Every structure is written in C-alpha cells, then in structure tokens.
Amino acid sequence: MSAGTAKTPLSNSFFSASLADVDPELSRAVQQELGRQQHEIELIASENIVSRAVLEAQGSVLTNKYAEGYPGRRYYGGCEFVDIAENLAIERAKRLFGCDFANVQPNSGSQANQAVFMATMQPGDTFLGLDLAAGGHLTHGAPPNVSGKWFKPVSYTVRREDQRIDMEQVAKLAEEHKPKVIIAGGSGYPRHWDFAKFREIADSVGAVFFVDMAHFAGLVAGGVHPSPFPHAHVVTTTTHKTLRGPRGGMVLTNDEALAKKINSAVFPGLQGGPLMHVIAGKAVAFGEALSPDFKIYAKQVVENAKALADTIISGGFDITTGGTDNHLMLVDMRPKNLTGKAAEAALSRAGITCNKNGVPFDPQKPTVTSGIRLGTPAATSRGFGVAEFKKVGELIVTVLDGLARAGEAGDGAAEKKVLEEVHALTDRFPIYA
C-alpha cells in the first residue's frame, strides 16, 4: 500500500465505535445515571428532563465547530451551518419572550449574569439584590462569588412575618445607596415578583432594572407567570430548569445600545468560541416551548406545585410564604425538629431527590439548614399530574415523620415501603424507554 493510501490505526473504529466499546467505565456511569433518572422522583427545582430531540442536537457534529463571533461576523470560516442554528435560537427566543434582542451564547446563567454586570457597571459599583439567605442567588452578590468580590452588593430581604419581598426596604435601600443596578430574581423565592414596582424604584434612582428569571422562565414562556418585559431593562435566564432545554444561559433585552454592550461582554469579554452543539439544543427547546403543548406543561407545573405544597402543609410542615405561585417551594423542617440535611438524606434513601436549603432567618448553618427545596418541573415532564403529586406529598410526609420518630438514621421500614411506591410510580411514567 502506498503512503498516499495508508490508513491510520484509528480509521476503522474512530468514527463508528460506541461509547460502551471505547470507554466501558464511563458508559457504565452514564447507564447508571440513566437508571437513577428513570427510577427516582426528581424534585430538585432547578432540574428537568429534556426531549430526545434536545439530546440529539446536543450530541451532534456541531460539537466539532469553532465559531468565535456572531452569525455573519465570525472569526473562522465554515460557519454557514452553525449560523443557521444560532439564528434559529435567537429568533425563537425573541418570539418566546416578546423581546427585540437575544444573546444565546452564555454557557450558563452565571455567565449571563456576569455579562450583564460587565455591560452595566464598573468594578466597585453598587447594586441591589435579594439576600442569598432569603432566596437569592450566589451571583447576586454573595461574598465568595465574583459579583460580591468585584462589585459592592447591597442586599434586600423578606419580611419576617410572611417571608415575602419587603418592597419598602427595597425602596429605602435604593434611595440610600443609589445603586447602578437593581436585581429581581433568585433561586428560592416561591412567589411572583412585582416587576412594575421594582422598575418604578429603579427609575427613581436612575438604576438599570435587571431580572434574573432563570427559575421561572419556562413559566413565563408558558403564559402562567408574569413576564418581566416591558418593565425590565435586561433579563437573563438559564435555558434548562422550567424552560426544559440544555444547560446554558441567555440574555434578553429591548434596548439596542445595551444589547451591543452585552454582545461585547459575552464575546470577547467573557467567552471565546460558543458551544454550538448546546446552542442547537437551545434552538430545539425554544421551538418546543413555542408549541401549545408547552403551555399545557407550564400550567401543569404550577398546579402540581400547589398540590404538593398543600399536601405537605396538611402533613404538619410549614411552607415558606404559606404556599407557592411558581414551580418551587421551601419546606421548613422546624415544626418536626428536623434539619434539611437529614431530610434530604432520608428522602434520597426512599428514591426521592431534593436538596437541603436554608429558609429565611435560618438558625442552622448553610451545610445543615432548616429546610428543603422541592420543585415540580422534572416529574411533570414525565407525566405526573395533581393526583401523582398529592401521592408524592404523602410519601414525603411518611418518610419525614419516620425520620422524626427514629432519629437521623431514619425509619428503614417506612423508607423501604416508600421506595417501592416510588418505583411503582416511575414505572407508570417511563422516560427514554
């Protein structure tokens, strides 16, 4: 065989061998994770289950393509087809949220937030955000985060008596500190936000009003949650969670001048080449979210959350704010003298996945907490309705009551029985079968 026709050692299998053939160890971990998702009830509020179409787009050959820049203005050749993917994502995002500009390149919600900070502030500038301990997010000024290191965060909180946003405090802090930016949004607040009032306060001090709707974007898209537009100057979101797309971020605005600053902040300010396979997955998910079926899904997410909250309250637990308007709730363990850490572990043993979470004015350490956070997006995606979520609420109460009786090791018999019922439920609503 001549040198010109010689084959490399990889050529026979490199493009055809499966993951199981090439890397059995990793393949086994993937299959185990698939089994976990299939047979456990996922109640982590920030997680969801994507369609097979999203998985296919994200696992496509678009992962091979470098595409620094923006559609039609790339720094590499050969981008004509990935431009189609990104333009589809942009146009669908704009339709979905009724805005004029969308940047779909951020690799995460955190990077989307960083881009907004870069576009609207200088290091050392002051901004207002919800305290992490009251349901805010790390990127809204927590001391370990870059937002707390490079800028001067001032935190507003919730009222002790009803755990709702203290808008009088927001107005007072804005007047006192004259922030450049005011943020609405968080990771543990179960009620609607008064976007109009926030904008009024922002206008009174000349601040940019920034909404981080990472948790409830899918509910906005589905028409069951108030939209931050037209009140917000700029909006960020993740593309997973309630929006049910691949893990990633996005920035939206109606302000052309601000959009240009955001584009520059994303690239070249924070990122180089965007992840085109993920952007393709975003395009697919946004297309799905434009369908009538998604509106039905979003409505069901909220109805399921209310049913779950009501059932848990009936079981003797407190829900922060007394209920929920969206997809999530914080369950206060203190009426049963439990910690969030112990509750998370007990529920995990029973096949129910959630996360420990602080509650407002929590006396426990962040690594222990007095609460757990529950959400309905993932189990709703697999087909659970109100009846199933009432049952899930009853199962949660059974496990936690057993924990209260037996101590930190939990009630093994109760947990085993609940695990069997969890498997019966998940078998009725299979995923990726």
Curated annotation (Swiss-Prot):
Q: InterPro entries, from UniProt?
A: PyrdxlP-dep_Trfase (IPR015424), PyrdxlP-dep_Trfase_major (IPR015421), PyrdxlP-dep_Trfase_small (IPR015422), Ser_HO-MeTrfase (IPR001085), Ser_HO-MeTrfase-like (IPR049943), Ser_HO-MeTrfase_PLP_BS (IPR019798), SHMT-like_dom (IPR039429)
Q: Which Pfam families match?
A: SHMT
This protein's pathway = One-carbon metabolism; tetrahydrofolate interconversion; Amino-acid biosynthesis; glycine biosynthesis; glycine from L-serine: step 1/1
Q: Tell me the disulfide pairings in this chain.
A: none
Instruction: List where in the cell it is found.
Output: Cytoplasm
Q: Which reaction does it catalyse?
A: (6R)-5,10-methylene-5,6,7,8-tetrahydrofolate + glycine + H2O = (6S)-5,6,7,8-tetrahydrofolate + L-serine
What positions are modified (N6-(pyridoxal phosphate)lysine)?
241
Indicate which residues the UniProt annotation says bind (6S)-5,6,7,8-tetrahydrofolate: 132, 136-138
The record's section on PROSITE patterns has:
SHMT
| Biological process annotations from GO | glycine biosynthetic process from serine; tetrahydrofolate interconversion
One GO MF annotation is: glycine hydroxymethyltransferase activity
The protein's UniProt keywords, in alphabetical order, are:
Amino-acid biosynthesis, Cytoplasm, One-carbon metabolism, Pyridoxal phosphate, Transferase
Site note Plays an important role in substrate specificity applies to 240
Needed co-factor(s): pyridoxal 5'-phosphate
One Gene Ontology cellular component annotation held by this UniProt entry:
cytosol
Q: What is its EC number?
A: 2.1.2.1
Family, according to the entry, reads as follows: Belongs to the SHMT family.
Its function, per the record, reads:
Catalyzes the reversible interconversion of serine and glycine with tetrahydrofolate (THF) serving as the one-carbon carrier. This reaction serves as the major source of one-carbon groups required for the biosynthesis of purines, thymidylate, methionine, and other important biomolecules. Also exhibits THF-independent aldolase activity toward beta-hydroxyamino acids, producing glycine and aldehydes, via a retro-aldol mechanism.
* Description of how the protein assembles with itself and partners: Homodimer.
- What protein name does the entry list? Serine hydroxymethyltransferase
